[in-house]
């Protein structure tokens, strides 16, 4: 009789990508695989080829909002839905990639006495995973320092995990996609899965100067492309899907937010990166800590947006390119492979199911 695994996680692409990597591995091994996500979350559009079950979710906010009064009831409803769904599905194990949708699933798993393994993509535990941790059998971490107060029996450091498609990127295909007229280094600018207005505005203020030395690929986010800008060597996209691995491989240097998924892929590809993390006022501070860790390891240059002018931004980009070989050399020292991390998680899941 085949085993059953449920995956959960969502809210941002970073809380889905690890599941997209793992799902085919379990399908290949003959497991029955299903997914639990939110009704309208990004995970619904990203997860394919498995049965998708939606449950009610409430967003876990750290700021005042009237929805904070409604969301506890949504979470309670989601717990009941998760409990019934897990009871009906009878999974052998559940794997959670975090995000607010995972909280009711973790509680539902505990009530059904089904083991749940949670994975934290960032350098500190997110609120959802903090809530889920007491119900979890194992915690898999991306950074070695994550969960310092969690017992070694429960915590396992597995390192960054990236999509296998990233390995298959082709530089020539990326060049054909962009059709740049001049042979210059390529600067890729990414603002995360939601885009980043601050980065978009800063880049556009500096375009004239940066284009003297670089071709620019700018991933702006949905609804954030500026059609009035038609400068040679500057290409804007709301989002890049299947072509992204080719674009990443083509890029000489990258400017990015400091979400774990993005910077893990850049580390895997050995791409020198200028990280501009979300500020503590805009998030729980995880991106700042991610960026600081990469900076300490010598993988990235970091600037904080509340201390940046157009001149300092331009200087940071030029400095990154000038010193790119130093960053590549430092990243070559990172020895943990993608396959190693994937197999480590699979082994943990198999061990828990025994």
Curated annotation (Swiss-Prot):
Q: For this chain's UniProt record, which GO biological process terms are given?
A: carbohydrate metabolic process; cell division; cell wall organization; lipid glycosylation; peptidoglycan biosynthetic process; regulation of cell shape
Function of this protein? Cell wall formation. Catalyzes the transfer of a GlcNAc subunit on undecaprenyl-pyrophosphoryl-MurNAc-pentapeptide (lipid intermediate I) to form undecaprenyl-pyrophosphoryl-MurNAc-(pentapeptide)GlcNAc (lipid intermediate II).
Gene3D superfamilies xref list? Glycogen Phosphorylase B
Q: How does it sit in the membrane?
A: Peripheral membrane protein
Q: Which domain of life is it from?
A: Bacteria
Q: What is the gene name?
A: murG3
What's the Enzyme Commission number for this chain? 2.4.1.227
Question: What are the record keywords, sorted?
Answer: Cell cycle, Cell division, Cell membrane, Cell shape, Cell wall biogenesis/degradation, Glycosyltransferase, Membrane, Peptidoglycan synthesis, Transferase
Tell me which NCBIfam families the record gives: PRK12446.1
Enzyme class name: transferase
One molecular function GO term is: UDP-N-acetyl-D-glucosamine:N-acetylmuramoyl-L-alanyl-D-glutamyl-meso-2,6-diaminopimelyl-D-alanyl-D-alanine-diphosphoundecaprenol 4-beta-N-acetylglucosaminlytransferase activity
The molecule here is called: UDP-N-acetylglucosamine--N-acetylmuramyl-(pentapeptide) pyrophosphoryl-undecaprenol N-acetylglucosamine transferase 3
Extract the HAMAP family matched here. MurG
Binding residues annotated for UDP-N-acetyl-alpha-D-glucosamine, in chain numbering: 12-14, 163, 193, 287
Supply the InterPro entries for this chain: GlcNAc_MurG (IPR006009), Glyco_trans_28_C (IPR007235), GlycoTrans_28_N (IPR004276)
Q: Does the keyword Chaperone apply?
A: no
Where is the protein localized? Cell membrane
Q: Name one GO cellular component term.
A: plasma membrane
Known catalytic reactions: di-trans,octa-cis-undecaprenyl diphospho-N-acetyl-alpha-D-muramoyl-L-alanyl-D-glutamyl-meso-2,6-diaminopimeloyl-D-alanyl-D-alanine + UDP-N-acetyl-alpha-D-glucosamine = di-trans,octa-cis-undecaprenyl diphospho-[N-acetyl-alpha-D-glucosaminyl-(1->4)]-N-acetyl-alpha-D-muramoyl-L-alanyl-D-glutamyl-meso-2,6-diaminopimeloyl-D-alanyl-D-alanine + UDP + H(+)
- Primary location: membrane
Q: Does the keyword Cell division apply?
A: yes
Regarding protein family, the annotation reads: Belongs to the glycosyltransferase 28 family. MurG subfamily.
- Which pathway does this polypeptide act in? Cell wall biogenesis; peptidoglycan biosynthesis
